[in-house]
Amino acid sequence: MAAKTKPQDWAYIAAAYQALNNNGLGYERMLALVQHIISSGASDRLFAYTSLDTLKLSNYEPLEESEVLCIHFDRQNQLFCFDYSATDYKLYDQEQPEFHRKYPAESGIEKFDQFLRWIRW
């Protein structure tokens, strides 16, 4: 059985990225994305937790390894990496999730909104 993770509060997630930025660690793009999720109202229907440079989101609570969008921000290359799988791809020995995309930092919010429409979240 897959591990289940309790979501974090969106204000906590935003504060975590703000603290990283305040320390000069370069997470402005992730903070902007989180602020967009909150201001757009998507936070009312999405559950999430963060682990430094990765934000994991789902429309189910608690979060599992399936039906989770993992957004990683590559600070060095200024790329958003989106990974999504309807199933726990690691459980089935797949090398990567069924949806794996990289986007330039300036496209991250737009691509996030497109993903939500595509997956109907």
Task: Describe each PLM feature range.
Residues 1-15, 87-121:
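Mixed-charge, Lys/Arg-enriched low-complexity segments
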Residues 1-63:
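Negatively charged, low-complexity tracts enriched in Asp/Glu with abundant Ser/Thr
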Residues 18, 74, 81-83, 113-116:
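Compositionally biased, low-structure terminal segments
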Residues 30, 43, 66, 109, ...:
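Generic N-terminal initiation segments characterized by hydrophobic and/or small/turn-forming residues
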Residues 62-106:
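Intrinsically disordered, low-complexity regulatory segments enriched in Ser/Thr/Pro
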